[in-house]
Amino acid sequence: MGRELQKRKKRSSRAKVQTHTIKKKVLNPQGSGIVAKAWNKKETLSQNYSRFGLVAKLGTAAGGMAKKSAAANYAGITKDDPLAVKSADRGLFEVREVKVERDASGKIVKVLRSDNPLNDPLNEIESDSESEEPKPKNPTHDIEWHGISDDRQEMIAQSSRPEVVRMLEEEASRPVEKTVRYQSERELEWLQRLVAKHGDDVAAMVRDIKLNPMQQTKGDITKRLRKAGLLQ
């Protein structure tokens, strides 16, 4: 049945909107001091890594990025047909400089036009070869250019890299100092007890359950003995 008072209540058909505050954990990188100094806490992980010139994930992005369509990629590319006949009239007059002859009063009498009105490049090459005299060879001009050298390319690549990447590469290229391992007194005592009981028989040392309870291998015991100077 139910209470009559509850039945008489006016229910609202509109649902109550509740906003939940999502507490995002602020990323605090602790792996590298270089990355921690350049980290911006107001940006996401992907934004920070893209600013550093690094990749946040080794795999491709599954989503969240706007993909360019094939039509957008080829929108700015115009394909020219080499066999197509193009009109010489472009709709606008081309402004260029010409030589003129003037009379005594300053009026233009004659316009000196070029011998190549169609701008044929072969005509210019032929006229240059006929008119010009052979010039003495300059050894500096005869040097063949083989492109940008590897050192120059490396310098350009280094200058275009972000500062964080350059500092990380410098840190990674530093030689790592090898840690020298010293044998403790207890280890030397254990090795001396093995030598006193078995001599040079390393195989017997491996099978000894009491003196070798940790089941050290033959190669490991041999290396320890040679390091201590107890085995030649």
Swiss-Prot record:
Its main location: nucleus. Pfam families: Nop16. It is found in: Nucleus, Nucleolus. Residues 1-20, 113-161 are annotated as: Disordered. Residues 1-14 have a biased composition (Basic residues). One of its GO terms (cellular component) is nucleolus. One of its GO terms (biological process) is ribosomal large subunit biogenesis. Residues 132-154 have a biased composition (Basic and acidic residues). It comes from the Eukaryota. InterPro entries: Ribosome_biogenesis_Nop16. Signal peptide: none annotated. Keywords: Nucleus, Ribonucleoprotein, Ribosome biogenesis, rRNA processing. Involved in the biogenesis of the 60S ribosomal subunit. Belongs to the NOP16 family. Component of the pre-66S ribosomal particle. This is Nucleolar protein 16.
